[in-house]
């Protein structure tokens, strides 16, 4: 499944940086009063973080459980998980699992991946009016639409590593903000790009 990545921080530095940055982001969202409740969904079955991803996100969950009353931290340990919001079902994964996949899911939907996703939808008897399959891994924005579901790729918040630049092109960094209405098909979506000098 996974591949080794060069690190420019020790494990301790990476843990500290991740915890501080994520808690800072959650605190800014919470104090902005942007929503009545904040849910943070973490996909930890991936080819990057290993057990570190679970441990770091569990530490954040423990902290948030003791600090905030309206912040929920979900940690997805299976490769693919889904949740419902109104007429929507969101199916989420990293795009490449931590153990079995030789290659990750593609940027553009292909017949093999489409069949795989349709089998997941059928297995879990997902009947939602709007189904969105969301993933990362390739650090690039991508969108395909089929009759049964949308296929969405998100960029990475972090700058691309040397490995990503070599294998996936010199991608951009940032995040996607989505506003989803419970009963409408298309979310309002805005991509926020971060210049490396801003980090």
Where do the protein language model's features map onto the residues?
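Core catalytic region of metal-dependent phosphoesterases/phosphodiesterases
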Residues: 1-66
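Charge-rich, low-complexity terminal tails
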Residues: 11, 31-34, 41-47, 175, ...
């Amino acid at each position: 499944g996974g591949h080794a990545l060069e690190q420019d921080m020790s494990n301790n530095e990476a843990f500290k940086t991740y915890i501080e940055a994520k808690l800072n982001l959650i605190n800014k969202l919470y104090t902005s009063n942007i929503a009545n409740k904040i849910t943070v969904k973490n996909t930890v079955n991936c080819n990057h973080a290993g057990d570190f991803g679970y441990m770091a996100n569990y530490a954040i969950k423990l902290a948030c459980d003791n600090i905030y009353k309206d912040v929920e931290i979900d940690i997805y340990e299976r490769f693919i998980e889904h949740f419902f919001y109104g007429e929507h079902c969101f199916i989420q994964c990293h795009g490449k699992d931590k153990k079995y996949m030789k290659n990750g899911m593609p940027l553009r939907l292909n017949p093999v991946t489409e069949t795989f996703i349709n089998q997941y939808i059928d297995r879990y008897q997902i009947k939602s009016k709007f189904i969105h399959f969301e993933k990362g891994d390739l650090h690039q924005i991508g969108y395909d639409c089929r009759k049964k579901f949308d296929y969405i790729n998100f960029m990475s918040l972090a700058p691309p590593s040397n490995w990503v630049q070599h294998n996936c092109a010199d991608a951009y960094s940032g995040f996607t903000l989505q506003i989803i209405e419970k009963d409408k098909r298309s979310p309002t979506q805005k991509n926020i790009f971060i210049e490396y000098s801003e980090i």
